[in-house]
């Protein structure tokens, strides 16, 4: 959409529950949300005890490999963070196990922490951002995780963790 010529006409069509934007061969259709939009700011953690900076390419490569195994187990991948590394673990009965460590920088927090995510949701954002590092921040294994990038201050992606039996305190 960044390459759209701002001088061209855009045809806008609105129905009861959809809006469409058409220009040349480009067509964008979106659903119109009825009622009051939820307060998304309530989900974004303001303070986080654990913050990590990870090289995006290394994290992406390991996460994609974990996703190959995780597809057989509801896409659940577990992450164990310590002072210098994140261990990425995926298991699937009959398919095998995956474990890989990726170097990171711990920005804040002192304890080793574990959290699990749907790897597809995490990959969606890591593949999309064009940055050298991604920042992950969360309080504990059940709190929302805030993913940010240094280059764009207003970019915030929230991913909710998955509760797993082996990652409960």
Identify what each model region corresponds to.
Residues 1-33, 48-169:
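DNA polymerase processivity clamps
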Residues 43-46:
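Short hinge/gating elements
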């Amino acid at each position: 959409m960044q390459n759209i010529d701002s001088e061209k006409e855009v045809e806008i069509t609105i129905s009861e529950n959809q809006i469409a934007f058409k220009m040349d061969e480009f067509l964008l259709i979106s659903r119109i949300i009825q009622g009051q939009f939820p307060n998304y700011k309530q989900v974004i953690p303001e303070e986080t005890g654990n913050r990590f900076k990870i090289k995006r390419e290394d994290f992406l490569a390991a996460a994609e490999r974990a996703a190959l195994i995780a597809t057989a187990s509801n896409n659940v991948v577990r992450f164990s963070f310590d002072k210098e590394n994140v261990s990425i673990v995926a298991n699937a009965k009959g398919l095998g196990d995956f474990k890989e460590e990726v170097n990171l920088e711990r920005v804040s927090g002192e304890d080793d922490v574990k959290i699990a995510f749907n790897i597809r949701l995490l990959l969606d954002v890591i593949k999309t951002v064009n940055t050298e590092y991604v920042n992950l921040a969360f309080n504990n294994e059940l709190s929302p995780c805030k993913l940010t990038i240094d280059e764009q201050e207003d970019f915030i992606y929230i991913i909710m963790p998955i509760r797993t039996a082996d990652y409960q305190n």
